[in-house]
């Protein structure tokens, strides 16, 4: 395997580890990211996990980019980050 292929594999494994909870008490690392509305101008209701308050909160999402700590429903947020 070429060095580029190995580097890509290492990057994918690192990303997978960051997005996968270690146990039921832990949550994915992206749950620690702040709410990010992104650069677009939409006004969509979304939810993010707030690690300081240890709960999911509502925010306005612009509709593009942002980060993985953005959920369409509070249930999805809680299931992913607050469980």
Swiss-Prot record:
Residues 1-24 form the signal peptide. The keyword Endoplasmic reticulum does not apply. InterPro entries: Kunitz_BPTI, Kunitz_BPTI_sf, Prtase_inh_Kunz-CS, TFPI/VKTCI-like. One of its GO terms (molecular function) is serine-type endopeptidase inhibitor activity. GO terms for cellular component: extracellular space. Keywords: Disulfide bond, Protease inhibitor, Secreted, Serine protease inhibitor, Signal, Toxin. The record marks 41-42 as: Reactive bond for chymotrypsin. Pfam families: Kunitz_BPTI. This is Kunitz-type serine protease inhibitor mulgin-4.
């Amino acid at each position: 395997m070429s060095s580029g292929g190995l580097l890509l594999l290492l990057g994918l494994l690192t990303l997978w580890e960051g997005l996968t909870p270690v146990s039921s008490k832990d949550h994915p690392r992206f749950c620690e990211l702040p709410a990010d509305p992104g650069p677009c101008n939409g006004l969509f209701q979304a939810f993010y996990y707030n690690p300081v308050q240890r709960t999911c909160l509502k925010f306005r999402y612009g509709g593009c980019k942002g980060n993985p700590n953005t959920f369409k429903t509070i249930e999805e947020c809680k299931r992913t980050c607050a469980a």
